[in-house]
Amino acid sequence: MKFTFSTLGYVLLMAMAFPVFAAPSNDETYKKLEAFSKVLGYIEDHYIEKVSTTQLIDDALRGITSSLDPHTTYLPPDLYKQMKVDTSGEFGGVGIELGYNQEKELVVIAPTEDGPAIKQGVLPGDRILSIDGKSTANWSLMETVKKVRGARGTTVRMMLQHKDDPKAFEVILKREIMHIQSVEYKLLNDGIGYIQVKSFQEKTDQEVERAFAKLQAQASKSDGKLQGLILDLRNDPGGLLDQAVAVADLFLDDGVIVSTRGRDNLLQGEAKAQVQGTLPYVPMITIINEGTASAAEIVAGALQDLGRSPLLGTPSFGKGSVQNIIDLEDGSALKITIARYFTPKGRPIQNVGNQPDIYVSSITPVLDEIDMVREKDLQGRIETIEESGLQKTKDKTGKTEPLKVVDIQLKTAQEYLKSSSFFQNKEAKRQ
């Protein structure tokens, strides 16, 4: 690793070596614990119906954490297992992204390129009617994921229906090791590179580094060199703190990337940029929006405060807290908020977010104005926000057609990179 932590450590998904539960501090605490034990026993012995003691305890643990901030929670074994899969970027599956259509039916959002599903003719929008002979009606996404994923080499049987074809068809898919790509990239016009970071999982820094190298190679074949870079952090929910630091460090050669403060606002640690491994300098701009959260906000804040990249878009989500995952013996875990993080200039992100240097609103074509929920709006949960539908336009024949969406934020970032004197001045200072 080319970044250093003073005392920060791996604070998102690595267990820390301190006791999970402190010893009761007084007699009152002992009495409350005794009361809890008695209530549990009475329910087991006398409740009108048989109940699962394990489920009762799980519910009680969730109840304890529900009175704290929204990011402190108890994770039962199945949820914790899923979280580890999401951050590792590898799992046994069939290569489909799941979701719901407007009728709230389970559908395939997109099949993965070269995955088992696409090879069997599975298409975007296909309804998932049943899995291994069981109807998927009223299934949650979590239930569906658990059924679809499994050990490499095993099979899953799915009954599907194409979007515009009433005839159902069955596929038997053999599970393979699937890799979740957290980074996408492409070379835009005028030699400008584009890198999108979808989340911060294991090896995201390596993916960004590879993307940058490939953009350089592509640019050298056309205009000679990479003229600029757009880093897209929109709708990036965050992820691993150490990966956020590593990605920021790719573009920085000096300065504090992030610092954390715990209970009583005491400094816990800080991560500093290092010269070694820093990517070659090119003018750069970073796009953020209301969905840019947590680890993504660390990267955006560091690039902005240290003068490496201006931010373009709308204010970010505002999740400026750090969570630690503590493994429990039964395979479950406690996710607990242990600190707040601050940008290089000491700015708190919690409930505030990063403010863009260049404000450019998104023009998502929906009929109703949507107020995006940010961290400051959270209490016990985040309510689901549903779009009411796309606006429609009419062609010359009078028929309606979907409104074409222009990514005005990306387009503005391109124009800014091509014309702004800001980057010319920065380049002159580096000479």
Please report, for each region that a protein language model flagged, where it lies by residue.
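Hydrophobic helical h-region of N-terminal Sec-dependent signal peptides
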Residues: 10-14
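Conserved functional hotspot residues or short segments at active or partner-binding sites
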Residues: 340, 345-431
